[in-house]
Amino acid sequence: MSTLSLCIATYRRPERLAAVLLDLTQQTRLPDEVVVVDNDAGESARPVVEARLKAGAPYAIRYAVQPQKNISLTRNKTVELATGNWLAFIDDDERAPLPWLAQLMDAAVRYKADGVLGPVNPVVPPNAPGWIRRGHFYEFPRMNSGSVIPPNRLRFGNVLVKASWLHRSAAPFDPSLGLTGGEDGDLLARLQQQGARIVWCDEAVVNEPVEPARLSLQWLLARALRGGQDFARHALVGRYGEMNELQRVNFFLTALCQAMAATGLALVALPLGRHHAARWLTTVSANIGKLSVLWGWRYREYA
């Protein structure tokens, strides 16, 4: 019989954490346990977990603190504590519709998968600027259910993984990426290279309310820059396939050309709407992120 652990790494989001813990009590396929690892040395998540236990929870809850500011170490602690033979992961700012876990588990069986990813649906507040709502900046491409996911689209936030794959290493998430991010895609790309079959389930949606702090061009450019750095680092170490020296040179020349072209297109697009210009500016930022790997600079999103 399959057992399911639900893993949450959290950092100073008590209200959001309380909401997702409530969602998990209402799942049509309940988790056997929920593992909450608090990355806040002040233990801000502890009262939330205790309140959930007091109110009643149809699953066991394991709570631990990982005080060092590092998302990789925090996620590694969830894997260490989880006892299920399947591990599902959800972010502490996401909401889980009732059939979510059942859909992930059903997809794992139906497609004979070692891992299943689902969509994260951004919920943009109605008072967001018009150009933000028109730009669809927080959405990611979706695929047909059962499709094997390309390595450059692998990420956490809504994922189910067979525990045996994660337990192959004492530290499945790379601690060196714990302040910059990108540790999730790096891990799944490595598992895929080792033979794990990771597929998409388009029905297993979670919702992510977009926080007010993210409703700005500054945030969009910073996230694009980090995404470009992640992509370049993963590409250069062979996560997307081996690269020879000529391919490496071409990679960076392409990034330079794309950054220059997108700069011009952003200026041309501005009269057509701020959202069009912003889209091209995120392309500029992503390619600058790729180029910045050449001089070793890292944007530390979680520092």
Where are these regions (language model features)?
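Conserved donor NDP-sugar-binding/catalytic core segment of glycosyltransferases
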Residues: 99-131
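Non-catalytic, C-terminal membrane-associated alpha-helical segments of glycosyltransferases
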Residues: 222-226, 240-303
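Short, flexible, basic/aromatic active-site loop/helix in glycosyltransferases
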Residues: 118-119, 133-152
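Acidic donor-binding loop at a coil-to-helix junction in glycosyltransferase catalytic cores
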Residues: 178-189
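Glycine-rich, basic loop-to-helix element that forms the pyrophosphate-binding segment
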Residues: 66-82
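Acidic donor-binding segment of Leloir-type glycosyltransferases
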Residues: 21-65
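N-proximal low-complexity "stem/linker" segments adjacent to membrane-targeting elements
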Residues: 1-26
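Short aromatic/hydrophobic "clamp" motif used to bind/position activated sugar donors
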Residues: 87
